Amino acid sequence: MGGWSSPSHWLIILLIVVLLFGAKKIPELAKGLGKGIKTFKDEMNNDDEVAKNTQKIEENKNTTNNTSADASIDKTKKA
């Protein structure tokens, strides 16, 4: 018993979906699902960009803080 990999199982599922939603409604559902997936992927990419920008800002802050600390050490040595 091959689980759900059998073509007859998929045919039965397809038949049930057509009976539940009707042949005209299925393309609309698929279109809505596709738009939802695209929006999700776009937001995931946007989230990655925000994370990269945040990381760059943190690196710049650390570099600035290290430079400021080095400058204050130099001032104390000269004094």
UniProtKB/Swiss-Prot annotation:
GO molecular function: protein transmembrane transporter activity
Location of this chain's protein in the cell: Cell inner membrane
Bias kind Basic and acidic residues: ranges: 52-61
Transmembrane spans: 1-21
Gene3D superfamilies named among the record's database cross-references: 1.20.5.3310
Metal-binding keyword on record: no
InterPro entries: TatA/B/E (IPR003369), TatA/E (IPR006312)
Biological process annotations from GO: protein transport by the Tat complex
GO cellular component: TAT protein transport complex
Domain of life of the organism encoding this protein: Bacteria
Keyword terms: Cell inner membrane, Cell membrane, Membrane, Protein transport, Translocation, Transmembrane, Transmembrane helix, Transport
Region (Disordered) location: 52-79
Pfam families linked: TatA_B_E
Membrane topology term: Single-pass membrane protein
PANTHER family: SEC-INDEPENDENT PROTEIN TRANSLOCASE PROTEIN TATA
Job of this protein: Part of the twin-arginine translocation (Tat) system that transports large folded proteins containing a characteristic twin-arginine motif in their signal peptide across membranes. TatA could form the protein-conducting channel of the Tat system.
Subunit structure: The Tat system comprises two distinct complexes: a TatABC complex, containing multiple copies of TatA, TatB and TatC subunits, and a separate TatA complex, containing only TatA subunits. Substrates initially bind to the TatABC complex, which probably triggers association of the separate TatA complex to form the active translocon.
Entry's family note: Belongs to the TatA/E family.
Entry protein name: Sec-independent protein translocase protein TatA
Species: Campylobacter jejuni subsp. jejuni serotype O:6 (strain 81116 / NCTC 11828)
